[in-house]
Amino acid sequence: MAFSQVQCLDDNHVNWRSSESKPEFFYSEEQRLALEALVARGRDAFYEVLKRENIRDFLSELELKRILETIEVYDPGSEDPRGTGPSQGPEDNGVGDGEEASGADGVPIEAEPLPSLEYWPQKSDRSIPQLDLGWPDTIAYRGVTRASVYMQPPIDGQAHIKEVVRKMISQAQKVIAVVMDMFTDVDIFKDLLDAGFKRKVAVYIIVDESNVKYFLHMCERACMHLGHLKNLRVRSSGGTEFFTRSATKFKGALAQKFMFVDGDRAVCGSYSFTWSAARTDRNVISVLSGQVVEMFDRQFQELYLMSHSVSLKGIPMEKEPEPEPIVLPSVVPLVPAGTVAKKLVNPKYALVKAKSVDEIAKISSEKQEAKKPLGLKGPALAEHPGELPELLPPIHPGLLHLERANMFEYLPTWVEPDPEPGSDILGYINIIDPNIWNPQPSQMNRIKIRDTSQASAQHQLWKQSQDSRPRPEPCPPPEPSAPQDGVPAENGLPQGDPEPLPPVPKPRTVPVADVLARDSSDIGWVLELPKEEAPQNGTDHRLPRMAGPGHAPLQRQLSVTQDDPESLGVGLPNGLDGVEEEDDDDYVTLSDQDSHSGSSGRGPGPRRPSVASSVSEEYFEVREHSVPLRRRHSEQVANGPTPPPRRQLSAPHITRGTFVGPQGGSPWAQSRGREEADALKRMQAQRSTDKEAQGQQFHHHRVPASGTRDKDGFPGPPRYRSAADSVQSSTRNAGPAMAGPHHWQAKGGQVPRLLPDPGSPRLAQNARPMTDGRATEEHPSPFGIPYSKLSQSKHLKARTGGSQWASSDSKRRAQAPRDRKDP
């Protein structure tokens, strides 16, 4: 019924007097009687009622004509959408596009029985239409209301109203709901079809039922296909109905014009979706957003509930084409990878000289490209011939060509108070526990920041040289008749695959490594590979070796006293008595990188053959894991002065303000070098007698018998020793009779030891001082004592506790003659 008729049923309107002159005037019983007379008896009866009731003529000639043309006889059976007959009108048999999709396979839908005409039916006459394509959720608050008004023709440089509507359609993502009295614009309709088919946006259209035929003509010109029906729902509706007492009714038209987009925007006004309304008619629209859009949401759902479906089966359509691939814009993550993020975000990594983001991204892309198979390398092929492959940029375009932040200035760092020349220390970082209110220096965790760029470059060069050099071949043992003809290949090391082996923990007792000379040697070593060396305490105490060209053969680094070498006693180790040894022994720290070949490192594999005088010099005990290897008198050797050991970057370093000399070594080492040169001149006279003892004959040195061990408890494999050791083995029972001015007594035995030939090329090579001009850093002891203070024996004894070391040496010397057995 009309709203005026509904108001009559309300108790508030009983005996309510309202005249035509009041604004609230809406319902009039006199007007209702005049309309019933018009519908039942025609125009003459209408004018008679107006004159009798003395009311105004409230209908125009156009309205009278429209009412008379739309009068219908009320027939309850004719309202059934499943019925048949010519009275269906624009509903077109009541089958819409939603039902058509379900019956598109050609199978006819079975007709249901007609509904009963009972007063209280058991089921409804028609089903409630559902928003099956989806609808935005109803939210409590949609935001602040905003409105923009657009005119046609546009004013003040505004966009024309058709452009505003089409832009809203192209920006829709969820749903588009259109209510229109006349819809015949093909351009707007094509935009709606593309939004539903390509972007999967739900499209609902409600048009006036009196103009459905014009809408269907427009669909024929739009070249639709079956794919457009998937996300499209079209329905029709009219105005409100006016029922009379003569079982007749008439209906108004749908004059609402609005479009509801995504639940938060709406456009409404006088603009109809026609070409004339956008070009020749004067119209106005309002673009609304915010809370006011809720009224359009509720109104459309109510209209959709009372609407009728529109069938599109009579429209010629093509088959559904292949869906075009959706090319999504490539989104580069703003957050970099974990390895890059550490260097960019964490201030600690800002101190390290790392590569730029471009270089890191380039290296990572090259690694990924190298991992691909050969058939997949290169840019990936596009799915379609017209498509070009998209290459993702390495970093976000907004970050290109931007200067990196220097986080070093924001850190609590400071330089070393007394830095050494060429130090790689950049600064320190203090980490403070936030739970401590006033932290003391002892409660701070101090982190030392070093420059690792040079060490990284050297490691890369060494790794490349390891990969590029040829594979070594085993060398047969030299003939004893020509002991000085050849040099053993690969330093006489065992041959095997250079597979990386896992690191082992640092042992408590470590063997002293033999120092490798830079030049080739005239002594060849023949090494018998042991099958297995028994580790002690689960730790392998063997030393790794680096086999490769460029490594010199083994050379024994002998220990002499800092006094006159000719005054060596017989029967006492190193020519010293117990008291003098306790006072004058200098301990020199050796690191893993001090030797020329790196043979002092720890790792699996058999040890190099050694020409040490006794087992007591082969092994020694290390008190703490953090204390490096120690050896007596390693700065003054019979083969010439060795360059001062260089401090490795990974070793802990504490400076005491002492610098090396201008010639690259300590003054004490230079004075010892001069004394050594004098000693070599005196040994030159005995060169002829020493040549016979320096033969390259090898004797098998066996392990002690079962149940016995070496001096430090290490079961050792069979070893080959040079002729210098064979002289000791053959003359053990002879006593110290052979000890001459150029022989020295072994520490653990009673057999004199022959010094190398002073005139050998190896000796001359090692006797040359460093001339490269590079000032090497001193390698301090674990207690921070530089080399220049090692000559002060009492100062060293106070720091390192020499009595403990001396007592351990005396025990080893006491049991050495018992443990050493003849081969």
From Swiss-Prot:
Region entry DUF1669, spans: 2-312
Effect of R630W: Found in patient with Joubert syndrome; uncertain significance
Acidic residues composition-biased segments: 578-587
Post-translational modification: Phosphorylated in vitro by CSNK1A1.
GO molecular function: protein kinase binding
Biased composition (Basic and acidic residues): 529-543, 672-681, 809-823
Modification Phosphoserine, positions: S4, S124, S127, S356, S610, S614, S616, S650, S666
Sequence ranges of Pro residues compositional bias: 497-508
Residue ranges, annotated region (Disordered): 75-108, 450-823
Modified residue annotations for N-acetylalanine: A2
Keyword match DNA-binding: no
Any single GO BP term: BMP signaling pathway
InterPro entries reported in the protein's UniProt record: FAM83, SACK1
Effect of S610A: Completely abolishes phosphorylation by ALK3 in vitro. NEDD9 and ASNS activation in response to BMPs is abolished
Keyword Cytoplasm: yes
SUPFAM superfamilies attached to this UniProt entry: Phospholipase D/nuclease (SSF56024)
Keywords: Acetylation, Cytoplasm, Nucleus, Phosphoprotein
Cellular component GO terms held in the UniProt record: cytosol; nucleus
Annotated localization: Cytoplasm, Cytosol; Nucleus
Subunit (UniProt): Interacts with SMAD1 (via MH2 domain); in a SMAD4-independent manner. Directly interacts (via DUF1669) with casein kinase isoforms CSNK1A1 and CSNK1A1L.
Family: Belongs to the FAM83 family.
Record remark: domains: All members of the FAM83 family of proteins share a conserved N-terminal DUF1669 (domain of unknown function 1669) domain of about 300 amino acids. This domain mediates the interaction with casein kinase 1 (CK1) isoforms. Therefore, it has been proposed to rename DUF1669 the polypeptide anchor of CK1 domain.
PANTHER family attached to this UniProt entry: PROTEIN FAM83A-RELATED
Protein known as: Protein FAM83G
Source organism per UniProt: Homo sapiens
Lineage: Eukaryota, Metazoa, Chordata, Craniata, Vertebrata
